[in-house]
Amino acid sequence: MTTLQTPTTPPPALIQLRAVHGGSADTAMIESWAGGAGWSLGRGDLALFTRHHPDGLLIGMLDDRPVSAMMIACHHDEICFISAPIVNPAYTGRRIQAATAAMGLSYLADRTVAVEAPPHMREFFAARGFYTCWRSITFAGPVPAPRTADPHVLPMDTDLLHQVAGLDTSCFPTDRTAMAIDWAREPGRQALGYVKNDRLVGYGVIRPGFGAARIGPLYATEPHIAAAIFDALAERAGRRGARSIAVDIPEPNPAARALCETRGLSHDTETLRMLRPGVRAGERAPDLTLLYGLTSRELG
């Protein structure tokens, strides 16, 4: 659960942040901003997020007007994952975005913080102690034609959901099992696992988006396992009427890129995974050989 601390040095500009709760009119407003602002939101993401992080969805106010939004997810006081702020499209320029990010960071004191930063914010975060870990690329395109189904790919029932911790904690710097399970079983989503010798060796989730259907996460111990899950998820999305799909991949995993390209997806946009080490250094590095699709840009 996200617990924010008292701000340290006030950031520039008079941006004030307040928490937004799931299902509110503010949530709908943020969703309407997100499509053209670089977030990879799926339907239901914000409601699920606020259940696990009640104070983590923040809206930026300037002279009592909503101008920006960001997400802060703190896990066990070990690491916080923040979203790059988005700005109300009625406002222009990057100063509001930077001021919102600065205000959000002021609540996190000396914690370890990770972010998927848009390229134009690289210098902003670098000046605040962040370094670049890798580039993340969004691949998008039409739903590919169905392929032969792999019998090892199965719906994620309760027993399989209880096995997600091993894969998720290998691909994320700390444990977030409860949220990972809820993410997979949220209504309207399809979660599929690859089972080998009664063991979960890969799983993925596809959810409706505000445009393309979005795959994420996608974890697998081998490339052919990732491909089988991807194909099954895409087939189900097409059956539900989706015309396009998107997935955010880590560039250092060439097998993830190859999978997207062989399925007809192309490079759409990109971000930079950046990290600021906290006083409790020693955070676990994700195993990128297992990571074929981020959960989302906002959550890592």
What are the residue ranges of the model-derived segments?
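Conserved acetyl-CoA-binding loop-helix of GNAT-fold acetyltransferases
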Residues: 87, 93-106, 223-236
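Ligand-binding pocket scaffold of soluble enzyme catalytic domains
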Residues: 22, 32-37, 50, 57-58, ...
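Flexible loop/N-cap segments at domain edges
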Residues: 201-207, 213-249, 262
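Amide-forming acyltransferase catalytic core, primarily the GNAT-like/NAT-type
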Residues: 28-32, 130-214
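Active-site/acyl-donor-binding loops of N-acyltransferases
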Residues: 2-4, 116-117, 128-147, 243-300
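A short helix-loop-beta-strand connector motif used in the catalytic cores of GNAT acetyltransferases and
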Residues: 47-68, 81, 135, 183-193
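Conserved N-terminal entry element of GNAT/NAT acetyltransferase domains
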Residues: 1-24, 142-158
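Conserved beta-strand in the GNAT
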Residues: 59-74, 80-86, 199-208, 212-214
